[in-house]
Amino acid sequence: MKKFEWKSVLALALTGVLALGLTACGSSDSKTADAGSAAAADGKAVYRTLDEIKESGTINIGVFSDKNPFGYVDENGEYQGYDVYYARRLGEDLGVDVNFVSTEAANRIEYLQTGKVDVILANFTVTPVRAEEVDFASPYMNVSLGVVSKDDNVITSLDNWNADDSIIVISGTTAETYLIANYPDIPLQKFDSYATAKEAFENGTSVAWANDNTEVIAFALQNEGYTVGIPSLGSADTIAPAVSKGNTTLLDWINDEIVALGEENFFHADYEATLADTYGLDYEDSLVVEGGKVNAQ
């Protein structure tokens, strides 16, 4: 698909989406605060309360380190991206330092349940199943699934699938869950990280890659020779911060913070600083959720 066609595709893909929630990062990813760094012996989730985080002077936030423009490490070794921008503001308003902990999609829940992180800001789509294991705060972005393929073999439908072909997914994502439930006969190639999935796709190991539509659209815009033939697959969802199940003090603070940030249009500023170069400004209002209010755009 030619470059000038991308605006119409992106508009169709994103205006129908409900809400996007992004993730945020910090300054280091090798350390976590002492409190809550290991799982309880009985297997129950462990977490630090809001006061404990304040007393420690550091909040541990799980973010992606390889998913540009949402969460990635730049050439200077610094975390950048939409989620990182938000994470730094959380730390600033809480009055603590941010310790960024690199996470993969498959271990987001585990990192919360074992106390490795206090908050996950890593493109975490809200689903009923996940909500049984973690507590989601109010959303800050809209998202649905999308499928990208090569220009010379554009995939526009998953019906009548060739059994010899496969689709790449990242383990622990909604794309994996959706395809297993709705297209059980389609072979899946599963990878643990965005980077390994991207490399495999570029090497031609599968004919398509399914992921959040914002991510596959960004990939196609940034890499010649690829088209998002399915810009919206399944239902529209939202992305939100997540904390350990039962950590009400931290959850309530984050929800109040999201409302306060909405009054200054913080997530629009975040978008313009981190996502505008990829998606442009025309889609800002359809992607951003302010104040946790999905229908307030």
Question: Whereabouts are the PLM-identified features?
Answer:
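C-terminal motif of bacterial Sec signal peptides marking the signal peptidase cleavage site
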Residues: 20-24
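Extended ligand-binding regions for polar small-molecule ligands
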Residues: 26-28, 34, 38-39, 84-93, ...
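Ligand-binding clefts/hinges and TM-proximal coupling segments of bilobed small-molecule sensing domains
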Residues: 27, 40, 44, 174-191, ...
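Extracytoplasmic small-molecule ligand-binding "clamshell" domains
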Residues: 36-123
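Short helix-initiation/N-cap motifs at beta->coil->alpha
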Residues: 99-110, 171, 189-203
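A ligand-binding cleft/hinge motif common to bilobed small-molecule-binding domains
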Residues: 124-132, 180, 202-203, 207-236
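Periplasmic-binding protein-like
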Residues: 142-149, 217-258, 278-297
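Flexible hinge/capping segments at coil-to-helix
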Residues: 149-166
